[in-house]
């Protein structure tokens, strides 16, 4: 069972429950040799860092001594590890030696027999760039074996969870086909296989394409494991694209060659030995100097280097988790991807899929949008803004520029005249920023240095396209001034207050509907005495009473509905827009203000994004409650564990 606890980009901090044991993802699974005598770092030290390890069931099965212990005492006793143990099936040996002496069903039976927590099918790891015919044939065989493995597990009611490995070489349509078929077989975890040769050749862009094309077809409610990815420099980008699990033999293999891992690359101990201290504060690097480590006999040196490599690997995973919680994972990705040109190339390739990524990126975050380079202009936050700008409807649009010396939010630092015209500021980051909503995340919750000319012209095409699509509504400076004079004159009897117009534009931008003039004139706007920003929107009710419609949240200026606001959304938007439909079994819990759990969601607006404000209804579209969705539209339809909507309040 898997649930999302925090998220940013496509990355998620998840809680994965396996045989009563809890794993927090993303995490790394250190590769452990089943023979303790061949293990570089002791299992006792690994256990202090890892909640899950991965070892090789094929090696155990083909070694009589190890096999006997595993069959009699179980794999946890063999290795001396009480937490979750995942096993590979021999696919690695198949990729190295070309053949192995085990059958697909036999290795599944063996993994179950020795008490493995998560087993792996005997897939065929197709190498990159092979002939298409070979890739198709090997994928066909992998899928056949997958079907046999699932059938065996289900018929014999095996306890172990199963990995269904995605193959297809470097043919993206085959990766999608593999993911789609594996999804139909309902595996528990989905490793993406045969990417190690690509990473060894620094072909990170191909790895990224494989991840994203696999993710397009994989279920959102199951973890994804990037098989063989063990270098920390690759973790941030991979997590941002939805990978939850990694495995690392690199910590030990690199140590044997005298290589010292960092989060941004690999150093050689030989090149460090003249330094007084290591560039790290792990226990190994505090205890020893580079010169001391270099002079040690090889076995001890390898062990200590491997320990450092393991520490730095887990440190990067923990740093990524913190970035997800803080809402600045993209900033970490942009920092990491500048460690190597090929990694930057991979990031740029990922951003070619930004419309897909945007579906999973939260609409609001704790941290501001920080510009890290030209690639930032393609991030999901900017793509979403440009799409949602189309929601704001106006018959009168005026586009203007503003001095670079004026700080955001522009509306608080300029003296534009009030009117119902849609005033758009040309902006280097977002293309066009409506003056009336420029306090909304991320339009003012952002920062950037002065941009170069090539960066400034990035949005020219977008602006020109917008002008062309709205050419009948665009006003020049003369017509705009004339319009302003008329609008503000006493002769205009239909004038609506500027605050009400601002709220109307915010409603359109956030929810996609607008209020008419009569409804706008009834709005009561309350501003903060301290900041002078709008804080509450109220409407008159019976007698002299007033009810809160929306509250503007201070950190992102989004409209958070109160009960009357939820009623308004329900009234104005057709089913299923901004709705989460729940089972009648839990209607009363929702009415009582209890959180909605995923397994009770039966329908929803498929266009929802994480952290949107939604209304909760039954199948008859009766309004039950309102709150914040923790999942997007696709996830709401696929998750069956954990919270789906954090309910603010219900309707009795």
UniProtKB/Swiss-Prot annotation:
Cofactor note: Binds 1 zinc ion per subunit.
GO cellular component, one term: cytoplasm
Essential cofactor(s): Zn(2+)
Keyword Transferase belongs to the record: yes
Record keywords: Glycosyltransferase, Metal-binding, Transferase, tRNA processing, Zinc
Pathway involvement of the protein, from the record: tRNA modification; archaeosine-tRNA biosynthesis
An MF annotation (GO) of this entry: pentosyltransferase activity
Lineage: superkingdom: Archaea
Domain PUA positions: 577-652
PANTHER family registered for this protein in UniProt: QUEUINE TRNA-RIBOSYLTRANSFERASE
Family: Belongs to the archaeosine tRNA-ribosyltransferase family.
Full protein name: tRNA-guanine(15) transglycosylase
Biological source species: Methanococcus aeolicus (strain ATCC BAA-1280 / DSM 17508 / OCM 812 / Nankai-3)
């Amino acid at each position: 069972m898997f649930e999302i606890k925090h998220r940013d980009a496509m990355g998620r901090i998840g809680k994965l429950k396996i045989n009563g044991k809890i794993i927090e993802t993303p995490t790394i699974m250190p590769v452990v040799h089943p023979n303790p005598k061949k293990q570089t770092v002791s299992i006792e030290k690994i256990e202090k860092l890892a909640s899950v390890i991965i070892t090789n069931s094929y090696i155990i099965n083909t070694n009589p001594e190890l096999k006997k212990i595993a069959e009699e005492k179980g794999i946890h006793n063999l290795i001396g590890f009480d937490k979750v143990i995942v096993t590979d099936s021999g696919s690695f040996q198949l990729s190295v030696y070309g053949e192995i002496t085990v059958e697909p069903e036999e290795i599944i039976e063996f993994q179950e027999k020795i008490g493995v927590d998560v087993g792996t099918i005997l897939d065929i790891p197709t190498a990159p760039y092979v002939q298409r015919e070979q890739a198709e044939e090997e994928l066909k065989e992998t899928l056949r074996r997958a079907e046999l493995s699932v059938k065996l597990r289900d018929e014999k009611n095996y306890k172990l969870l199963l990995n269904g490995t995605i193959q297809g070489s470097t043919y993206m349509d085959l990766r999608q086909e593999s993911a789609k078929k594996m999804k139909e077989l309902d595996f528990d975890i989905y490793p993406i296989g045969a990417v190690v040769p690509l990473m060894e050749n620094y072909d990170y862009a191909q790895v990224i394409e494989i991840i994203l094309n696999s993710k397009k077809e994989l279920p959102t409610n199951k973890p994804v494991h990037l098989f063989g990815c063990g270098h920390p420099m690759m973790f941030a980008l991979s997590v941002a694209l939805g990978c939850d699990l990694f495995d690392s033999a690199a910590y030990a293999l690199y140590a044997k060659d005298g290589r010292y891992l960092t989060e941004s690359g690999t150093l050689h101990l030989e090149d460090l030995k003249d330094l007084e201290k290591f560039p790290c504060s792990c226990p190994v690097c505090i205890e020893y100097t580079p010169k001391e480590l270099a002079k040690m006999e090889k076995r001890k040196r390898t062990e200590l280097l491997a320990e450092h490599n393991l520490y730095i690997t887990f440190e990067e995973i923990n740093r990524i988790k913190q970035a997800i919680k803080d809402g600045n994972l993209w900033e970490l990705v942009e920092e990491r991807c500048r460690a190597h040109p090929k990694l930057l190339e991979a990031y740029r390739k990922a951003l070619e899929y930004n419309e897909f990524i945007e579906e999973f990126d939260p609409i609001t975050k704790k941290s501001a949008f920080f510009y890290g380079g030209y690639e930032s202009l393609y991030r999901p936050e900017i793509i979403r803004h440009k799409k949602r700008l189309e929601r704001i409807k106006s018959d009168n649009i005026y586009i203007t520029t503003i001095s670079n010396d004026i700080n955001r939010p522009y509306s608080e630092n300029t003296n534009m005249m009030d009117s119902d015209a849609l005033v758009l500021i040309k902006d280097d980051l977002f293309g066009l920023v409506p003056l009336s909503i420029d306090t909304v995340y991320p339009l003012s919750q952002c920062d950037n240095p002065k941009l170069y000319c090539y960066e400034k012209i990035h949005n020219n095409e977008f602006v020109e396209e917008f002008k062309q699509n709205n050419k009948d509504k665009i006003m020049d400076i003369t017509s705009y001034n004339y319009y302003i004079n008329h609008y503000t004159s006493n002769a205009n009897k239909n004038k609506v207050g500027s605050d009400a117009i601002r709220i109307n534009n915010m409603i359109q931008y956030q929810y996609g509907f607008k209020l008419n003039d009569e409804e706008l004139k009834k709005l009561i706007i309350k501003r903060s005495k301290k900041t002078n920003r709008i804080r509450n929107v109220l409407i008159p009710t019976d007698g002299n009473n007033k009810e809160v419609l929306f509250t503007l949240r201070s950190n992102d200026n989004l409209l958070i509905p109160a009960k009357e606001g939820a009623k308004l959304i329900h009234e104005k938007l057709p089913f299923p827009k901004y709705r989460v439909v729940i089972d009648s079994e839990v209607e009363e819990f929702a009415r009582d203000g209890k959180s909605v759990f995923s397994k009770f969601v039966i329908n929803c607006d498929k266009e929802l994004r994480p952290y949107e404000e939604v209304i909760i209804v039954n199948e008859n579209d009766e309004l039950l409650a309102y709150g914040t969705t923790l999942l997007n539209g696709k996830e709401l339809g696929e998750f069956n564990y954990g919270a789906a909507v954090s309910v603010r309040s219900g309707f009795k």
